[in-house]
């Protein structure tokens, strides 16, 4: 269960303790950490005037459980639907009681609460999520991970030590953009493969487009992480890569089952949890083999090649390097492919916006044989606006989560330290209060200036509050893969929409299923009509 004192915060998970010691330091000095007083709170006048924690609206434990029973209000809903229904029932702030060892969780849809939470998260933000992953790495397989849980599951100084090592490699723009030539080549190969699978008469694909996107994403992230080509876009793909993609689908489903939904696995290892451990064993074995193979090739005939993430991190710490690259291979498939598919869907449903974007792309690439460079990709304002707008309407995560390290007042209620806070960003991104005509795909709302007579900036159509739109999170725990994902998405969309006019074929909107992310599912079919070169 969760415990909190004035010295430590931890959760005991079958002998595994996540420590947040006030006497430790992170990315700075002890005095800096002490000044923030992660485990202390100041009882001020605002706190004394606030309503009590017990007055926050919300269901009882039994009521909450009934929602997921057959016939319950939240039965068979995805995370988008669940947030919307609960907000309709309880308003812009409500509390879900803790269960199965998890803390109470306050859900808020107030951007002022978002800012309050982020501004008080300290230098060691506490984001509990993948506890099953932490158990696997630190308790089940310490032989492989040597005490390193990774950025997704470690907390406190352990998390900070890892983050400080990987930030210069993964968050520095120029360090990431040096991968552009190869990522462009991978995207061109993806287009070539689509062409072999496209019916020339109906312009439809004969294969699963979403699965093909996953193969592109895997090929891209494996190059960035390992400087390795898997051959997934060729006629002879690596069979282990296909196996890994399948195991990753299972992993995302299991993580949702054991880390998001109520589960007894922390008290009793169920048959389903043992299947999860086996799935993760398979993932670990495959990724370990890829890493070992890549390491054997380092230093041989480099000829000035760009160092991949693994090679750069090995210069600092082998344990961190291996774990970080495993995380990249795991997280870089479904997340990036789902985001790409979502943005493409919105552009396919809005042909006039797509045509405006294509004019920009034709300027960048007059012919499909031209290459993407740092120079010609500097000025792509409409593409980047389209990406922002697509992720505004449908972010692959509905919100951001933190454990409060100090007492806070949110929406006029006392929220004691140690409470979980879920900030429902996606709900606000689809609220007319913050985005005019929020259900409409309007990239122009993100432009700073007019681009053409028919592409005029309308920043008034979006809120000026910076805490409403946060697809990659905020603060020290901003998504570590943000720079890589942005580059991959931009490169793929440039190539795809420069080559084809894309239309959405199903009569119904795209559907999403909940794993630990929102993933497109159901009937996913596009029409791809070739676009010629400029004469």
Swiss-Prot record:
SUPFAM superfamilies: Cytochrome P450 (SSF48264)
Cofactor needs: heme
Enzyme class, broadest EC rank: oxidoreductase
Oxidoreductase keyword on record: yes
Binding of heme, residues: 479
Keywords: Heme, Iron, Membrane, Metal-binding, Mitochondrion, Monooxygenase, Oxidoreductase, Transit peptide
GO molecular function, one term: monooxygenase activity
Family matches, as Pfam families: p450
Main localization of the protein described in the UniProt heading: mitochondrion
Family annotation (InterPro entries): CYP11_CYP27_families, Cyt_P450, Cyt_P450_CS, Cyt_P450_E_grp-I, Cyt_P450_sf
Gene Ontology CC: mitochondrial membrane
Parts of the chain that traverse the membrane: none
Enzyme Commission code(s) on record: 1.14.-.-
Subcellular location as annotated: Mitochondrion membrane
Family: Belongs to the cytochrome P450 family.
Name by which UniProt lists this protein: Probable cytochrome P450 12b2, mitochondrial
């Amino acid at each position: 269960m969760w415990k909190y004192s004035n010295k430590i915060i931890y959760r005991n998970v079958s002998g595994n303790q996540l420590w947040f010691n006030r006497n430790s330091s992170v990315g700075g000095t002890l005095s800096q950490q002490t000044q923030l007083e992660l485990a202390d709170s100041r009882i001020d006048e605002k706190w004394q005037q606030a309503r009590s924690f017990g007055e926050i609206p919300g269901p009882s434990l039994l009521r909450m459980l009934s929602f997921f029973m057959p016939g319950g209000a939240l039965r068979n809903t995805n995370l988008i639907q669940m947030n919307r229904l609960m907000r309709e029932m309880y308003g812009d702030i409500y509390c879900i009681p803790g269960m199965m060892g998890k803390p109470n969780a306050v859900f808020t849809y107030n951007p002022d609460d978002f800012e309050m939470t982020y501004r008080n998260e300290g230098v060691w933000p506490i984001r509990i999520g993948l506890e099953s992953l932490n158990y696997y790495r630190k308790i089940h397989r310490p032989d492989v991970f040597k005490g390193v849980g990774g950025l997704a599951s470690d907390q406190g100084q352990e998390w900070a030590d890892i983050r400080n090592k990987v930030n210069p490699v993964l968050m520095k723009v120029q360090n990431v953009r040096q991968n552009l030539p190869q990522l462009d080549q991978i995207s061109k190969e993806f287009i070539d493969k689509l062409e072999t699978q496209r019916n020339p008469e109906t312009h439809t694909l004969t294969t699963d487009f979403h699965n093909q996107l996953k193969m592109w994403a895997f090929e891209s992230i494996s190059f960035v992480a390992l400087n390795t080509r898997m051959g997934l876009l060729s006629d002879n793909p690596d069979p282990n890569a296909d196996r890994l993609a399948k195991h990753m689908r299972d992993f995302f489903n299991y993580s949702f089952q054991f880390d998001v939904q109520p589960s007894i696995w922390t008290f009793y290892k169920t048959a389903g949890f043992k299947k999860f451990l086996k799935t993760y064993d398979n993932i670990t074995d495959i990724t370990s083999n890829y890493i070992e193979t890549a390491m054997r090739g380092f230093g041989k005939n480099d000829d000035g090649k760009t160092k991949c993430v693994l090679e750069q991190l090995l210069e600092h710490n082998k344990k961190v390097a291996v774990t970080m690259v495993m995380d990249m291979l795991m997280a870089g498939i479904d997340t990036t492919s789902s985001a790409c598919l979502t943005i493409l869907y919105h552009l396919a449903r809005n042909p006039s916006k797509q045509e405006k974007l294509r004019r920009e792309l034709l300027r960048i690439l007059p012919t499909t044989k031209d290459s993407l460079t740092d120079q010609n990709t500097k000025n792509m304002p409409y593409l980047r606006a389209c990406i922002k707008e697509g992720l505004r309407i449908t972010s692959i995560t509905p919100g951001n989560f933190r454990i409060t390290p100090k007492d806070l007042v949110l929406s006029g209620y006392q929220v004691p330290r140690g409470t979980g806070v879920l900030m429902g960003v996606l709900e606000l991104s689809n609220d007319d209060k913050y985005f005019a005509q929020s259900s409409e795909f309007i990239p122009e709302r993100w432009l700073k200036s007019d681009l053409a007579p028919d592409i005029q900036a309308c920043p008034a159509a979006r809120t000026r509050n910076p805490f409403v739109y946060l697809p990659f999170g905020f603060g020290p725990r901003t998504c570590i893969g943000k720079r890589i994902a942005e580059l991959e998405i931009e490169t793929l969309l440039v190539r795809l929409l420069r080559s084809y006019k894309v239309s959405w074929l199903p009569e119904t909107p795209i559907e999403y299923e909940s794993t630990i992310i929102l993933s497109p599912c159901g009937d996913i079919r596009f029409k791809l009509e070739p676009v010629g070169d400029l004469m």
